[in-house]
UniProtKB/Swiss-Prot annotation:
Name of the encoding gene: tesA
GO molecular function term, any single one: fatty acyl-CoA hydrolase activity
Protein name, per record: Thioesterase TesA
Domain of life: Bacteria
Naturally occurring in which organism (per UniProt): Mycobacterium marinum (strain ATCC BAA-535 / M)
Phenotype seen when the gene is deleted: Deletion of the gene leads to a drastic reduction in PDIM and PGL production. Mutant shows increased susceptibility to several antibiotics. Mutant is highly attenuated when injected into the zebrafish embryo bloodstream, but virulence is retained when bacteria are injected into the notochord. Deletion leads to an increase in growth yield in vitro.
Amino acid sequence: MNGRSSNSKSDEKLTAPTLYIFPHAGGTAKDYVPFAKEFSGEVKRVAVQYPGQQDGYGLPPLESIPGLAEEIFAIMKPAARIDTPVALFGHSMGGMLAFEVALRFEAAGYRVLALFLSACSAPGHIKYKQLKGYSDNEMLDLVARATGTDPEFFNDEEFRVGVLPTLRAVRAIAGYSCPPENKLSCPIYTFIGSKDWIATREDMEPWRERTTGDFSLREFPGDHFYLNKNLPELVSDIEIGTLQQFDQI
């Protein structure tokens, strides 16, 4: 790529960086194949399949974002090499998980080049965070009132078994928080859609407080899934950011 330095590394050959891709809630690794294919061969891409997703789709079993991140990191760690720099990208809920996993990578001594967050509100700025304290029955009652459904319908055990995991996942996402002292040393680069009401500029700006490194925010035209129509530009930003950090090793 233009502007890459040849004298910032020592003579030994470094392993190409790995970019871990964290899908949105309900998304799968397969959904991000077009995204991954936009990159050049200079960056290895690994799309994360969340543990526990039934038949490879739907929301994973989720009691808390940090809990799922811990499980994901435990799965990733045996295959991750300490001498291979990593970067992480996450969209929406995937951004929360990417941040938590990045914290774990840094704590374990891995070199994290950068964290890329897309349409993901910062901890403490997530919509509907009041849902964190809701019980299962209160969540069901909220759905009944919001949809006009007869509350008696939710007494059906088969229906409850089917819908409650999703509601618990929504509750966990809405209630995600993280101690303010938990920060990364790598840069955080953020991206939003101009018409996204789920994660706004005001919701994402506080991510700058979660790194001791650089921070940037870029706005693309579009809504919460703006990336579908802006893949080449988004991927270019991510690849350039990753390789620039790689060149500084």
